[in-house]
């Protein structure tokens, strides 16, 4: 039997904050878990780092909707880690921006990592 990913054992609910850190710049944080950045532009919103699953991404979206009704048009994935990229589909963004190396990792490890993260955050 394969050994579980380290993050898989951490099932505790995290304290979430959503703070404005600059004009139209927001930080979504959950202690011990990856953060997401939010940039509110003139016409739309950009998310930086997507979260581990669509359910977790929806927590970001819920907070974004409290401060703007502009559409989420772009998701930027700075690098590959399952907990940062696998929630990207939840945003319905026109563009997902990521480097070729990160894209390759999604193609190579995506399903295995999805299975792990979905067990952690169903």
What are these regions (language model features)?
Residues 5, 18, 28, 118-121:
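Phenylalanine-focused residue identity feature
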Residues 18-63:
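Conserved beta-strand hairpin/beta-sheet module of binuclear metal-dependent hydrolase folds
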Residues 6-20:
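Short acidic, Pro/Gly- and aromatic-enriched capping/linker segments at domain boundaries
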Residues 62-122:
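Active-site HxH/HxHxD metal-binding segment of metal-dependent hydrolases
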């Amino acid at each position: 039997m394969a050994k579980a990913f380290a993050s898989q054992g951490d099932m505790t609910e995290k304290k979430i904050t959503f703070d404005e850190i600059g004009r139209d710049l927001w930080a979504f944080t959950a202690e011990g878990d990856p953060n997401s950045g939010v940039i509110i532009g003139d016409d739309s919103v950009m998310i930086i780092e997507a979260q581990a699953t669509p359910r977790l991404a929806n927590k970001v979206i819920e907070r974004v909707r409290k401060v703007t009704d502009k559409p989420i048009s772009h998701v930027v994935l700075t690098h590959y880690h399952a907990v940062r990229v696998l929630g990207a589909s939840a945003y319905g963004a026109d563009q997902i921006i990521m480097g070729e190396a990160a894209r390759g990792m999604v193609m190579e490890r995506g399903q295995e990592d999805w299975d792990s993260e979905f067990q952690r955050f169903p």
